[in-house]
């Protein structure tokens, strides 16, 4: 629609949202149409009236801040002469080709037998001989011996506890010729008992692995004599070579924008304070598909660049073609800019790292040319709910033992957790691109948990993967409540189950095959434990309801009594308790030895440990049920999504807790009732399980409260060193988060369409810079017409994304919304500003300014 037929509207409302001088505003107020206004702003006639708003993007963006952007050389033009912001470096493409997976051993054997070769692979290097490789192999054989030996002894004790002592009294020849029901009655107790024994062995071996890992970590940290730790190989604070350029990349997707950019700014300023800023570039790699959040990201990027003087160092890229999730996001970065950097540090959306930590990682890479990945041990901090503070305390107190223990057993063939780690770019690009898993179904397609796979591929290519467990200055945040943690666990569960398909892929190192196995067991142990408990209940029912057979052979003189050995039961129970809880006690002993002041003192840290143990006992059965559901959902192909409602202060509403935990509560009540009916004395053994399920709703809600978390901190309970003496990076993150929330941009897409400056920023940062081809123009016209017709509330997500990515369509929509006075858009924009208590105090309806009608 042309401006000549547009509805009259006030220019002053539009001009009020541009930071103009009184003289500029008075001059522009004489315009008679919005097309004329944009041409005056652009100081040149537009090629056509439809392009007037596009021509004024530059002046609308730079008014009041032109010198700042020009000094940083941030302004440029695209191939069509449209203004754009230099939000990313020039693209210098590098070839990134993922190797197709061949997960089927039989197919590989058949191809070899028939003389067909597999697809050529990138050349791999042999990891040079080193003493640590021999030591690591010996240590892992010792660990395997300890685990198997301990499990065999425990299994022997468990066999002695169970009432039916083996299959020796079952005559297999007889059961073949007797009626089926008699066979079932005779075999059922022994089958149950054997199944219980097998499950017990698997679960006990899993617990044993954790125990020996924590024990060796305790000894490593207590003595401090780890001669193989990677952090001891650097010469100290030597200058970083100019060619050792490092990219800090932060992949994000629909994240909390104020917190993301607060952590990024704190990290950036810490690197600047270290004096090594010229060796680092920062990239925010967005996969966000929520247009409101995407616009908020754009504004936050501009703000952090202005406030931290980060123009030319902090870059932003939002993908329009979102494939392969996070691994695809990183692939895209490597393909565009990876060849320009020697190293890459991957950050999570909640990561914060100190400049000294980052500089140390680069120095360690330089000092260890055979290292492909060096993973730090991030410290959890920054959350205030009771649940989060309990988890922060647990990871801060017990976590170092397990991290140091992992390093002890794995050395240079270790874990990579996907963030807060440095990666050598060249081998990563050549060997760690991830192809989709072949086939169909829930365990095919894009790899979800990319980190373990990338570490395995890096080691397969001949590069070491290390954990710098003692390197300070690496931080992360934990979920604020149980349900948010379980939401994350569902994705991790599906990803780890998918990764197990790579267990037999050719060339994988045995350690990383074990990593795939432990990743599966992290979640598969839950249904195994649940099945163990169900079978134990079934065995109880069998002993209670079925008439025992004391004489099972013809002419048997003496009855065969079920056996019970309480001394073995007590010994096995005590051993299991030691394996489960001794690592926690050792952690506190280590704190006593090293100094407990930062944890609130010896008494407080001990009391905190006891309370955390009680809390973990309450939560373990709840997690067991949820993880069992997640495993079943993955095998059944259910989508791994869980849309939780918005919550105030990250707390869990009672309604959501009832919906999520209600079935568990009913299960706990029914289970307890059944056991009480069968054998009330057995209920005492099952009480920790069913009691936790019954109490899951109030525990989930109460633990999510910030007030209780802060009260515990006031009492020095669950205190961690980062709360006792907060590092400057975390102080800065907290400060910037509060500032960002105060000025947070809401209803971003509506503002990008209607607001003069927000529209200019969105147009300048848009990436779909197509030419004037007829099909493209037709599509643009269709999208603009649809947006004007249905308004912001009726516009679907794909159309929103397409408009936000296209500077031409977005500027045309902006001009026509104002020219036609489209109330569907303008009223929502006004309401957004009215509802924003921290928006600039600009008049929406200026009364003292002349209201020229636009023809």
From Swiss-Prot:
Gene Ontology CC annotations of this record: plasma membrane
Cellular location(s): Cell inner membrane
Pathway: Glycan metabolism; osmoregulated periplasmic glucan (OPG) biosynthesis
Annotated signal peptide: none
Annotated GO MF terms: hexosyltransferase activity
CDD domains (UniProt xref): Glucan_BSP_MdoH
Keyword Repressor: no
Chief site of localization: membrane
Membrane topology: Multi-pass membrane protein
Key words of the record: Cell inner membrane, Cell membrane, Glycosyltransferase, Membrane, Transferase, Transmembrane, Transmembrane helix
Broad enzyme group: transferase
Source superkingdom: Bacteria
Residues that span the membrane, as ranges: 142-162, 196-216, 515-535, 572-592, 606-626, 682-702
Keyword Chaperone: no
EC number: 2.4.1.-
SUPFAM superfamilies named among the record's database cross-references: Nucleotide-diphospho-sugar transferases
GO process terms (BP): glucan biosynthetic process
Family the entry assigns: Belongs to the glycosyltransferase 2 family. OpgH subfamily.
Chain's role: Involved in the biosynthesis of osmoregulated periplasmic glucans (OPGs).
Name the UniProt record assigns to this protein: Glucans biosynthesis glucosyltransferase H
């Amino acid at each position: 629609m042309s401006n000549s037929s547009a509805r009259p509207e006030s220019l002053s409302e539009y001009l009020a949202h541009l930071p103009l001088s009184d003289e500029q505003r008075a001059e522009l107020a004489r315009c008679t149409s919005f097309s004329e206004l944009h041409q005056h702003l652009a100081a040149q006639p537009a090629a056509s009236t439809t392009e007037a708003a596009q021509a004024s993007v530059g002046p609308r963006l730079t008014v009041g801040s032109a010198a700042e952007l020009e000094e940083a050389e941030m302004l440029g033009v695209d191939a069509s002469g449209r203004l754009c912001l230099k939000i990313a470096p020039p693209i210098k493409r590098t070839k990134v080709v993922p190797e197709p997976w061949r997960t089927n051993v039989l197919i590989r054997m058949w191809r070899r037998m028939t003389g067909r070769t597999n697809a050529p692979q990138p050349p791999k290097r042999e990891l040079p001989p080193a003493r640590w490789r021999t030591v690591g192999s010996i240590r892992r054989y010792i660990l395997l011996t300890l685990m198997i030996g301990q499990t065999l002894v425990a299994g022997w004790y468990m066999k002695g506890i169970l009432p039916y002592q083996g299959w020796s009294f079952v005559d297999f020849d007889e059961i073949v010729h007797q009626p089926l029901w008699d066979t079932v009655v005779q075999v059922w107790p022994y089958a149950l008992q054997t199944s219980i024994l097998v499950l017990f062995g698997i679960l006990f071996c899993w617990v044993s692995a954790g125990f020996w890992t924590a024990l060796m970590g305790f000894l490593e940290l207590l003595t401090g004599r780890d001669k193989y730790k990677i952090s001891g190989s650097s010469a100290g604070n030597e200058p970083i070579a100019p060619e050792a350029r490092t990219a800090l990349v932060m992949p994000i997707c629909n994240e909390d924008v104020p917190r993301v950019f607060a952590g990024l700014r704190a990290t950036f300023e810490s690197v600047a304070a270290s004096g090594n800023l010229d060796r680092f570039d920062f990239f925010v790699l967005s996969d966000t598909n929520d247009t409101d959040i995407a616009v908020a990201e754009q504004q936050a990027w501009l703000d952090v660049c202005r406030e931290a003087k980060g123009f030319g160092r902090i870059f932003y890229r939002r993908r329009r073609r979102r494939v392969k999730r996070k691994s695809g996001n990183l692939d895209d970065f490597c393909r565009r800019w990876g060849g320009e950097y020697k190293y890459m540090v991957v950050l999570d959306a909640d990561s914060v790292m100190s400049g000294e930590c980052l500089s140390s990682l680069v120095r360690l890479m330089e000092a260890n040319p055979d290292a492909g990945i060096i993973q730090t041990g991030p410290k959890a901090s920054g959350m205030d709910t009771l649940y989060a503070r309990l988890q922060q305390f647990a990871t801060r107190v017990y976590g170092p033992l397990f991290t140091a223990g992992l390093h002890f057993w794995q050395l240079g063939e270790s874990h990579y957790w996907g963030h807060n780690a440095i990666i050598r770019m060249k081998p990563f690009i050549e060997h760690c691109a991830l192809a989709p898993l072949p086939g169909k179904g829930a365990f095919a397609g894009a790899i979800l948990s990319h980190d373990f796979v990338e570490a395995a591929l890096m080691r397969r290519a001949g590069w070491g993967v290390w954990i710098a467990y003692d390197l300070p200055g690496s931080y992360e945040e934990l979920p604020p409540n149980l349900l948010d943690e379980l939401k994350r666990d569902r994705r991790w569960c599906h990803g780890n189950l998918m990764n197990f398909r790579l267990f037999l892929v050719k060339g994988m190192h045995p350690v990383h095959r074990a990593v795939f196995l432990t990743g599966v067991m992290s979640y598969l142990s839950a249904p195994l434990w649940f099945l163990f408990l169900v079978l134990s209940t079934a065995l109880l029912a069998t002993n209670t309801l079925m008439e025992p057979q004391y004489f099972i052979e013809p002419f048997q003189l003496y009855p065969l009594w079920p056996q019970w050995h309480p001394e073995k039961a007590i010994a096995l129970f005590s051993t299991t308790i030691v394996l489960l809880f001794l690592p926690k006690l050792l952690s506190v002993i280590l704190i006593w030895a090293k100094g407990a002041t930062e944890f609130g003192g010896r008494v407080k840290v001990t009391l905190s440990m006891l309370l955390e143990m009680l809390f973990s006992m309450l939560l373990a059965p709840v997690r067991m049920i949820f993880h069992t559901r997640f495993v079943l959902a993955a095998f059944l192909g259910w989508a791994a999504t869980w849309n939780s409602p918005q919550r105030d202060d990250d707390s869990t509403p009672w309604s959501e807790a009832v919906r999520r935990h209600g079935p568990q509560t009913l299960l706990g009540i029914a289970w307890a009732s059944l056991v009480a009916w069968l054998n009330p004395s057995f209920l005492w053994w099952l009480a920790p399980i069913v009691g936790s399920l019954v109490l899951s709703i109030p525990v989930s809600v109460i633990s999510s409260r910030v007030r209780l978390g802060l009260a515990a901190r006031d009492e020095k309970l669950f205190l961690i060193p980062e709360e006792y003496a907060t590092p400057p990076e975390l102080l800065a993150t907290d400060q910037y988060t509060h500032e960002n929330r105060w000025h947070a941009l809401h209803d971003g897409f509506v503002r990008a369409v209607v607001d003069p400056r927000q529209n200019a920023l969105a147009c300048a940062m848009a990436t779909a810079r197509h030419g004037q081809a007829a099909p493209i123009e037709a599509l643009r016209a269709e999208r603009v017409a649809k947006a004007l017709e249905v308004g912001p509330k009726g516009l679907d997500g794909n159309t929103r994304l397409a408009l936000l990515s296209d500077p031409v369509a977005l500027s045309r929509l902006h001009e026509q919304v104002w020219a036609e006075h489209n109330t569907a858009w303008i009223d929502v924009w006004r309401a957004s500003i009215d509802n924003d208590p921290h928006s600039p105090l600009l008049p929406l309806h200026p009364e003292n300014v002349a209201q020229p009608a636009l023809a």
